[in-house]
Curated annotation (Swiss-Prot):
Species: Bordetella pertussis (strain Tohama I / ATCC BAA-589 / NCTC 13251)
GO cellular component assignments: cytosol; plasma membrane
Note describing how the cofactor binds: Binds 1 prenylated FMN per subunit.
The keyword Heme belongs to this UniProt entry's keyword annotation: no
Xref: SUPFAM superfamilies: FMN-binding split barrel, UbiD C-terminal domain-like
Major localization listed first in the record, in broad terms: membrane
Subunit and partners: Homohexamer.
Enzyme category, top tier: lyase
The enzyme's E.C. designation: 4.1.1.98
Name of this chain's protein: 3-octaprenyl-4-hydroxybenzoate carboxy-lyase
Catalysed reactions, semicolon-separated: a 4-hydroxy-3-(all-trans-polyprenyl)benzoate + H(+) = a 2-(all-trans-polyprenyl)phenol + CO2
The gene coding this protein: ubiD
Biological role: Catalyzes the decarboxylation of 3-octaprenyl-4-hydroxy benzoate to 2-octaprenylphenol, an intermediate step in ubiquinone biosynthesis.
Bilayer topology: Peripheral membrane protein
C-alpha cells in the first residue's frame, strides 16, 4: 500500500494489529525507552503513548515509538508487501545509479520511462498551504522543552531528538539533501547538530561555509513525515536524485512539499512538526560562545557556533565520547493541529536502527551486484551494529577472488566505508546462517594465509576500540574453498547424502514412528 502521510500509515498499522495505543501515563525519561525496547525485542507493534508525561507534567502531544520496529513494517513503509520485495527497490536504485545499456528498442523505451518517472514525474510538488504550518511558534514561543523529547538512558547528558529529518541544500546544489542526524537540546531554541563529515548535510554545510563564509546556513528539521520520505532519507539514493523524488517513486505519487516560512528550503507538507532555523556564524549576536571543559580539546575553527555534544547511549550499546558539532538555532516551530511527536531510542542491538538495517540489507544486494556481479548474497548482522561486520557469499572464479571482493565492498558504497570485518564465503554457504558461516571459517580458513589486515583506514568515530578517533584497522576473512595457487594441498570434498537414498527415506518417513 501507499500512504499519504504518517497518520494514514498509522491507521493501516492499527487495522493490521501493528499499532498499540498506550493510555497509561508513561514518562519520556527512561520509562518510554524501557517499554519500547522490550516490545521491539519481542517483535511487537508500534507504540503510541497517548498519555506521555514530560518534565513531570502531561505532554502536549502523544509520542510515537517503534514505528519501524519490525522488518515487515519497514517494507510496508516503503510500499512493499514484504521484506523480500525490497530487492525490487534495490534493483531500481541500481538502475538509477548506473543504467545498463539497453538490449533493444523495447528495453530502451522502458529505461527512458523509468528515468522519466524518477527525474521528472516524481519531482516534488510544491503546494501553497500545508498541514505542517497550521500552528506556528515564533519568538518567545519557541521552546523546545514543550516537545516531549525522550531521555533514553541514565547516563545521557540531556534529552535526544532522534528522528528528525534534516533538510539542507549546498550553494551549488539544485537538489535538497535529507538526512537523519541526532540532535541535543541546549536550551529553549538551540540544538547540537551531530552529523559525520561524510554525510550529506555536513557536506552541504562545508560547501556553504567555503562559498559564503560568515553567512548563516539555513536548515529545517521535519518530524513525523510520511513513511516513504522518512525511509528515503536512510536509503542510499544516487547523488543525482533527491530523496523527495525517491519517496515519490516508493509512494507512487509526487511528494508534496511547502516552502519553509523563513528560508527557501522545502519541507514535507504533511509533516507533524517542523523546526526552522540556521547554523549561525560565531560572531552573530545570537550565537553563544563555546564552553571548553577543563582538559577537553577546543572546538575546530569553523567560524560557526559550536558546542560539545554527548555523551549519549548509542547504537553500539555504549555511551559515546564527546565531540564538537555545529549548533542549530531554531527560529520557529510549525506543526499540524494535534501533532504526533515521532521518537526512537538507540542502544545495544537490536534497536530500531538495527531493524532498519536488516530490511535495507535487501536493498543493498542489487546495488552491490551491479559493481560485483559475482555476489550471491550479502548480510549485515544486526548484532554487528548493522554495518561493522558483513558476510558475503560469492561465485568464486579464481585464486585471490575473495580479496578483490573485500576491497570492492570497502569502496563501492559510502555506507560500507566503516565496515570493520568482512567474511567472504562460497555460494554453498548461507551468509545469514551463523552455523554455516562458522563451519566455513573453521574448515576453509588458515588464520595466517586467509586473513587480510588493513591499517589506518576510515573508521566510525564512535568506535572507541580504534587506536585513533576516525582511523583504525579492518579485517577481511577469506572463508572460501581454496584454489590452486592459494594452497598446494588436496582440498576436502564436502559430504552429501545420495539423493536417491534421501527420496527413499522421505517415502518411508511416516512409517518410522519418528
Amino acid at each position: 500500500m501507499k500512504y499519504r502521510d504518517l497518520r494514514d500509515f498509522l491507521a493501516q498499522l492499527e487495522r493490521q494489529g501493528e499499532l498499540k495505543r498506550i493510555t497509561a501515563p508513561v514518562s519520556t525519561r527512561l520509562e518510554m525507552t524501557e517499554i519500547a525496547d522490550r516490545v521491539l525485542r519481542a517483535g511487537g507493534p508500534a507504540l503510541l503513548f497517548e498519555n506521555a508525561r514530560h518534565n513531570d507534567a502531561p505532554a502536549d502531544m502523544p509520542v510515537l515509538a517503534n514505528l519501524f520496529g519490525t522488518p515487515r513494517r519497514v517494507a510496508w513503509g516503503m510500499g512493499a508487501d514484504d521484506v523480500g520485495a525490497l530487492r525490487e527497490t534495490g534493483e531500481l536504485l541500481a538502475s538509477l545509479r548506473e543504467p545498463e545499456a539497453p538490449k533493444g528498442l523495447r528495453d530502451a523505451l522502458a529505461k527512458v520511462s523509468m528515468l522519466k518517472a524518477a527525474l521528472w514525474d516524481m519531482s516534488p510538488k510544491t503546494v501553497r498551504s500545508a498541514a505542517c504550518q497550521e500552528i506556528v511558534w515564533e519568538g518567545a514561543d519557541v521552546e523546545l522543552s514543550r516537545l516531549p523529547i525522550q531521555t533514553c538512558w541514565p547516563g545521557d547528558v540531556a534529552p535526544l531528538l532522534a528522528w528528525g529529518l534534516v533538510i539542507t541544500r549546498g550553494p551549488n546544489a539544485r537538489r535538497q539533501n535529507l538526512g537523519i542526524y541526532r540532535q541535543q537540546p541546549l536550551g529553549p531554541n538551540k540544538l547540537i547538530m551531530r552529523w559525520l563529515s561524510h554525510r550529506g548535510g555536513a557536506l552541504d554545510f562545508r560547501d556553504h561555509a567555503q562559498a559564503h563564509p560568515g553567512k548563516p546556513f539555513p536548515i529545517t528539521v521535519a518530524l513525523g513525515a510520511d513513511p516513504a520520505t522518512i525511509l528515503g532519507a536512510v536509503t542510499p539514493v544516487p547523488d543525482t536524485l533527491s530523496e523527495y523524488q525517491f519517496a515519490g517513486l516508493l509512494r507512487g505519487s509526487r511528494t508534496e512539499v511547502v516552502k519553509a516560512l523563513g528560508s527557501d528550503l522545502s519541507v514535507p507538507a504533511s509533516a507533524e512538526i517542523v523546526l526552522e532555523g540556521h547554523l549561525l556564524p560565531a560572531d552573530d549576536p545570537r550565537a553563544v560562545a563555546a564552553v571548553v571543559p577543563e582538559g577537553a580539546n577546543p572546538p575546530p575553527a569553523t567560524g560557526y557556533e559550536m558546542a560539545l555534544e554527548g555523551p549519549y547511549g548509542d547504537h553500539t550499546g555504549y555511551y559515546n565520547e564527546q565531540d564538537w558539532f555545529p549548533v542549530f538555532t531554531v527560529d520557529r516551530i510549525t506543526m499540524r493541529r494535534n501533532p504526533i511527536y515521532h521518537s526512537t531510542y538507540t542502544g545495544k542491538p537490536p534497536d530500531e536502527p538495527a531493524v532498519l538495517g536488516v530490511a535495507l540489507n535487501e536493498v543493498f544486494v542489487p546495488l552491490l551486484r551491479r559493481q560485483l556481479p559475482e555476489i550471491v548474497d550479502f548480510y549485515l548482522p544486526p548484532e554487528g551494529c548493522s554495518y561493522r561486520l558483513a558476510v558475503v557469499s560469492i561465485r568464486k572464479q579464481y585464486a585471490g577472488h575473495a580479496k578483490r571482493v573485500m576491497f570492492g565492498l570497502w569502496s563501492v558504497l559510502r555506507q560500507f566505508m566503516y565496515t570493520k570485518f568482512i567474511v567472504v564465503v562460497d555460494e554453498d554457504i548461507d551468509p545469514r546462517d551463523w552455523t554455516e558461516v562458522v563451519w566455513a571459517m573453521t574448515t576453509r580458513m588458515d588464520p595466517v594465509r586467509d586473513t587480510v589486515l588493513v591499517e589506518n583506514a576510515p573508521i566510525d568515530y564512535l568506535d572507541f576500540a580504534s587506536p585513533v578517533s576516525g582511523l583504525g584497522g579492518k579485517m577481511g576473512l577469506d572463508a572460501t574453498n581454496k584454489w590452486p595457487g592459494e594452497t598446494s594441498r588436496e582440498w576436502g570434498t564436502p559430504i552429501h547424502m545420495d539423493e536417491a537414498v534421501k527420496r527413499r527415506v522421505d517415502a518411508m518417513w511416516d512409517t518410522l514412528g519418528l
